[in-house]
Amino acid sequence: MTKIWVEVAYALPDKQYVIPVELTLGDTVEQAIIASNILTICNDIDLTKNKVGIYSRPAKLSDNVRDGDRVEIYRPLIADPKEMRRKRAEKARQKTE
């Protein structure tokens, strides 16, 4: 069996986790996440809700990983991006007046 190395990454506002994991060729994104033990380190991760990706590209838990991949677990947005842009623009307008 061919061994491969991947990284599992998860970022909180105050701490980032990047965990290297040795897997077997043909293993999935979900297997990489489980092997990293990130689910026990960060108990706020719910794989039924959190989206995942490989190098910033959306992925499914069933997708195969390749040697050198970085599996990323994404947190849900806490603010609407459109609303935040509107507030920044309004604040900038007030500064120029």
Curated annotation (Swiss-Prot):
Q: Which domain of life is it from?
A: Bacteria
Membership in a protein family: Belongs to the UPF0125 (RnfH) family.
Q: Which HAMAP family does the UniProt record give?
A: UPF0125_RnfH (MF_00460)
Q: Which organism is it from?
A: Proteus mirabilis (strain HI4320)
Name any one Pfam family assigned in the record.
Ub-RnfH
InterPro entries named in the record: Mopterin_synth/thiamin_S_b, RnfH, RnfH_sf
Q: What is this protein called?
A: Protein RnfH
